[in-house]
A protein has these predicted regions:
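A broadly used, surface-exposed interaction patch
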Residues: 91-93
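Structured, hydrophobic secondary-structure cores that serve as assembly/anchoring elements
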Residues: 1-88, 99-389
Length: 389
């Protein structure tokens, strides 16, 4: 504190001890496929379908993702990353090469921007082995990027029994960062006036996620009357009994009701079957956790330059506490007070002396989601300076 020797008005800037953490975007979608034009194996951001038309020449009968992008913006999407692959939409071109940054790995190049939702509609037209390879790689990639995958089913899966059988065959693809919907959808085809086109639901649902995120928050379940499917209709009618059978296997139903029309009527991840009993069974719980993880990780990079000691741990707890309290106040968690809704641990019990010597600080965050579940716990590891540096 400076010492003032004469009367007067003095202004002093006092540094804040709490670092502000901004929430990251939640519904920026990525699409991978062949397109008529545009940069190859480079992710390009578009913020409207008109912009997509200018950059990639719009709809193409051979490009499933071009229709998915149309549906995405029609249903409320605001930002899309588009990756054009070369040589056809095969497993090899879609997955790409991590070293060369091709295929889905072209999305590495958007940093410091992020994507949150991944759709690969063309995968549904591949043979079984290629489909499995693409979806397995996409789930792994989404896990690394804290993103969520919406999986499209093949056009041949057009009855409830076929869907249940297909899901059992593809049980190896169960993952908490992915969801699947039945049935496929029918949309008007602008390239074939008066006709419709059968499409996967991923683009439509990505738009629904974005619309509901913007209106209610990422913690809101993307299902029910508000989750209407704009410009699309279901290709199979599902009754309550069939809905229950699908739900038991973690398959989300798309339904038509006389009073509300075509809507999403399920919110389970691919880890949401009754047998899995996963804490990540619900889409809003998983996506909220991904949002919190990414926001806290990105918002705590200032710790890279501070000594890894009690002062740093206190600052982290304060900064994280402000962020989580703000989420509590807008209704993201259960509980009547903040202490019931979340907790934060960052001290000598989470960060050992060995961690300190290696410049690592560990933070444990738990929260009570709105969906019926116990406290969900996430772990965040950040690089910090060594004590004395």
């Amino acid at each position: 504190m400076p010492e003032y020797l004469a009367p007067g008005v003095f202004i002093e800037e006092v540094p804040a001890c709490v670092h502000t953490i901004e929430g990251v975007p939640t519904s920026s979608a990525a699409f991978i496929d062949i397109f008529q034009q545009g940069p190859l194996n480079k992710a390009m951001q578009v913020t409207s379908f008109a912009e997509f038309e200018r950059a990639f020449r719009g709809l193409d009968a051979g490009s499933e993702a071009s229709y998915a992008i149309l549906q995405y913006f029609l249903n409320g999407g605001k930002s899309a990353w588009v990756v054009r692959v070369d040589g056809g939409a095969t497993a090899e071109t879609i997955v790409g090469d991590p070293a060369a940054k091709t295929g889905m790995h072209a999305l590495d190049g958007i940093a410091p921007n992020i994507f949150n939702i991944l759709t690969i509609p063309a995968a549904a037209n591949l043979d079984q082995n290629s489909f499995t390879a693409v979806i397995s790689a996409a789930e792994k990639y989404c896990s690394e990027k804290r993103a969520f995958l919406i999986v499209d089913i093949p056009p041949t899966i057009n009855t409830k029994d076929k869907m249940l059988s297909w899901m059992e065959t593809n049980d190896c693809l169960r993952h908490h960062n992915a969801a699947i919907y039945f049935p496929r959808l029918e949309i008007p085809d602008p390239l074939n006036a008066g006709s419709s086109r059968n499409v996967g639901a991923s683009g439509t649902l990505a738009g629904v996620y974005a619309r509901m995120d913007g209106a209610c928050g990422v913690w809101k379940t993307p299902a029910g009357g508000a989750a209407d499917l704009r410009g699309a209709s279901v290709t199979v009618q599902i009754n309550d009994s069939e809905n229950g059978a699908l739900n038991a296997l973690g398959i989300n139903a798309l339904r038509n009701f006389p009073t509300i029309g075509n809507v999403s009527w399920g919110a389970r991840t691919l880890a949401g079957s009754y047998q899995e009993a996963s804490e990540w069974k619900y889409i809003p719980v998983r996506r909220l956790a991904l949002y919190i993880e990414e926001s806290l990780y990105q918002g705590s990079k200032w710790a890279n330059f501070d000594p890894n000691d009690e002062l740093l741990w206190t600052q982290i707890r304060l900064s994280f506490g402000v962020f989580m309290t703000n989420l509590f106040r807008v209704g993201a968690f259960q509980g009547t007070k903040a202490g019931d809704a979340f907790f934060i641990k960052c001290d000598g019990t989470t960060t050992s002396q060995d961690d300190i010597d290696r410049g690592i600080v560990n933070i444990v965050v738990g929260f009570a989601p709105l969906a019926p579940a116990e406290f969900v716990v996430i772990y965040i590891q950040q690089i910090a300076g060594r004590v004395g540096e």
